[in-house]
């Protein structure tokens, strides 16, 4: 017995039991429907890429978290840490085979060696949607609109999309003579929610004067004492003045917000200049989405515009904007908020097995229900009924079916609709003799 290997998973990695995986699959189905409704198409890319592909524009913090190693051929490879950088490589490699604007969605696992905590894992599922090949404010807006629609479809309504613009912040940093340190400043500011203002001020003071560090903190607080953070337009005007006046970036934000107001989703959008996104490839509008009832879990959907990402892989720059839903983090949040899981299986009806039953007849009945779009399965052997009831309970199967001991295939073949069975409602603990046609009606009614 001492030679047995202890069954366990690595820290930050997880197994998914059926109920959890069903919940995740159903959420993904809803998301895919939204993406398709908005004109997005699916792609897939490898989990493993050349390290130089993934790390050239990711930033030092990300490079520390990436799973990187030499493969059996001695190649320097890494597990993808997001789905955006592989997208840039994909577009550069397949440019002649795709069309622009290219609207894609991608659901897949990514890997980051960060510290595991509530809602944060080292292996997790991301759900990305991006549009490449257009620099229009309409495309930026459409991503925000899609975030709103997607989260609503998942049953999430109490949230805010926090929006900012890197260009405005970079212009502000230029006024402080900190342009050369802008990427480091952005990474420090991105840690504000994790480490707090005092620690951010300390880190900023390491690369600038104390006066400049305090000005940066004042900027990312976003508002003066007279302004409310919910007032997008006043906040934008305030930051515009700090950055030196109007320019194309502040115009872009006004154009986006005009579209936001036009479709009536302004209550879900807030201007938050502390949002900078730690990845170096973002160049324009950036955003993160927080649940009002559970802000501590972090952003459940984030992204932004990246105008230069494909320049690493091709001479032509193809601009893009997109977002990523952290589906596993969102599921963890829904569980913490008390949302109930849907089902433990997709089976509607279990046909019980008794010693005298004819399996041929049982499977003919399965075919009958399948034709009626009802998922049925046969318990494979005539075990004691308490075993079969437990099986149905564990799989959350509401309906059970017993064959009459005198039932025969010939009787079923003559008139399947009128063939009588015993239908057991295992939720209400009732049992009725009924023709199959009526059983179909009862089961369908319970699913609606």
Swiss-Prot record:
CDD domains: HisRS-like_core. Coiled coil: none annotated. One of its GO terms (molecular function) is ATP binding. It is an enzyme of class 6 (ligase). It catalyses: tRNA(His) + L-histidine + ATP = L-histidyl-tRNA(His) + AMP + diphosphate + H(+). SUPFAM superfamilies: Class II aaRS ABD-related, Class II aaRS and biotin synthetases. It holds the Pfam family tRNA-synt_His. It comes from the Bacteria. Its EC number is 6.1.1.21. InterPro entries: aa-tRNA-synth_II, aa-tRNA-synth_II/BPL/LPL, Anticodon-bd_dom_sf, His-tRNA-ligase, HisRS-like_core, HisRS/HisZ. One of its GO terms (cellular component) is cytoplasm. The keyword Metal-binding does not apply. Keywords: Aminoacyl-tRNA synthetase, ATP-binding, Cytoplasm, Ligase, Nucleotide-binding, Protein biosynthesis. The keyword tRNA processing does not apply. It is found in: Cytoplasm. Gene3D superfamilies: Anticodon-binding domain (3.40.50.800), Bira Bifunctional Protein, Domain 2 (3.30.930.10). One of its GO terms (biological process) is histidyl-tRNA aminoacylation. Its main location: cytoplasm. Homodimer. Belongs to the class-II aminoacyl-tRNA synthetase family. This is Histidine--tRNA ligase. It comes from Treponema denticola (strain ATCC 35405 / DSM 14222 / CIP 103919 / JCM 8153 / KCTC 15104).
